[in-house]
Amino acid sequence: MMAAAVVRAEVRRQRREERKKMAAARTTEDPPENHVVADVACGTGAVTRSSSSSLVVSSSSASGSDEPSSASPLSFPVCSPSTAVRSPGSAGVSTSLCSVERMVELSAQSPAADFSVSEAWRFEEAVNMALVACEAVSPYDRFRLIETPDENFLLVTNVIPRESAEVPVLDSSSSGGDSGPEDKKKNVGNKTAGEKNGGGSRAKRRRRRRAPKNDAATPSFLRRHDVLERFAAAAEPLPSLCVRDYALRNADRVTYDGELIYGSYLLYRKAHVELSLSSNKVQHVEAVLRQVYTPGLLDHHNVCDVEALLWLLYCGPRSFCARDTCFGREKNGCPFPALLPKLFYEPVRDYMTYMNLAELYVFVWYRGYEFPAPTPQATTAGSGGGGGAGACAVETSASAGRVDDAGDEVHLPLKPVSLDRLREVLQAVRGRFSGREVPAWPASSRTCLLCALYSQNRLCLDLARDEARTVSYSPIVIQDCAAAVTDVTLSHILPGQSTVSLFPVYHVGKLLDALSLNDAGLITLNL
């Protein structure tokens, strides 16, 4: 209310000043046509310039015609009379267009003394009056300032028209094939009456708008109600959600000739296999750290220390295969790194998704884990270097790949990371996910690629014949390693189609023999 009162007072003051100035300047010559132009158009009104040097807001026709009517004009005085410029197709949009071409021309003239002060005042007044007109048309809307190529600016509001669509009410006459003989007679009688009155179309529109009072008693309505009752009786109630185990339960059994449940295929390529089995992921992590700290990529709840988070994900003590019989222990003397989704082995496209999944895996893998206290030797070395016991760095030897005495911790660090940083990251991740229901089932497995393929082979050969009710497993498919695929597959016959292979069986021994490890910790797959 106060803002509206201030605007009205300002308009009245400008009117009084304008009357005085126009009375003194009646004999002066009018400015050029492109001096100052203000135009406002909307779905319910249009702004034009009248002969009395005022900005007139008048209502237009409902059909969007450009010709303004003479009903209830609202006048706003302006400094100079000129012809309003209407942009084509502007009906339905509230706009305010103020030309600044004349302003630019006058400011570029030399000498500067020729530039009249009244010209600048008139331009400023035109801009103010355009704002007042827009606020008068739509006082509660926000404006968007758009600069046009011809050095104009456009104030736009009410871009979306506010029209209420009228939904016709269907009566018994529009029920289609369910209408009986009585309904047909009623329709014929209504049509004849409408034609006699010369307003058949108007009678139809009135019938659509007016719902019949006895709609529930018509035979067609009763028949439709019976059909809906039969559909409702045949529907089965939804099962109660008692346990959230995030498992797929869309099949009853696993057989060769029945239904086989499987998740989406996990597609990997040769490059993904090499990076997933390699203990040295320095180049990949450095590429991630190069862009991850760009403002706007991450949210406020993400972990701040991304380097420590990636250390825990790629080379922390819980980032390796948890099987006691891992193939990596026989091949290299230490287990292979745990298998992650494919996006962790590719250039990052969505940093938000990447970081959220990384935090989820770290939370699940390190649940209940605490880093051991530093040894006295490490404490002495840390204090001698100027750091305390909590600031000592995790071991970073080039010959990493060594299993400790406990048998479940492997240290393959990327770069030296202090224990304090790791503890802070774990605390931040636990604070984010603790006490919340998170899909921990997909991330709970700490299995390398070769052990996962071995389990997939066992599933195909052993578990398929046991009539298992549910198999929640996503088959792994290596796309460009066809030489390692055997002829043994679990398949079933689809009706009218050929045999479809669902779970491919891979030759794990051939894949293991094709791996070669260099001194830098990189693995190459020679297939």
From Swiss-Prot:
The keyword ATP-binding does not apply. Belongs to the herpesviridae UL95 family. It is found in: Host nucleus. It comes from Human cytomegalovirus (strain Towne). The keyword Ubl conjugation does not apply. This is Protein UL95. Residues 9-33 have a biased composition (Basic and acidic residues). The lineage of its organism: Viruses, Duplodnaviria, Heunggongvirae, Peploviricota, Herviviricetes. GO terms for cellular component: host cell nucleus.
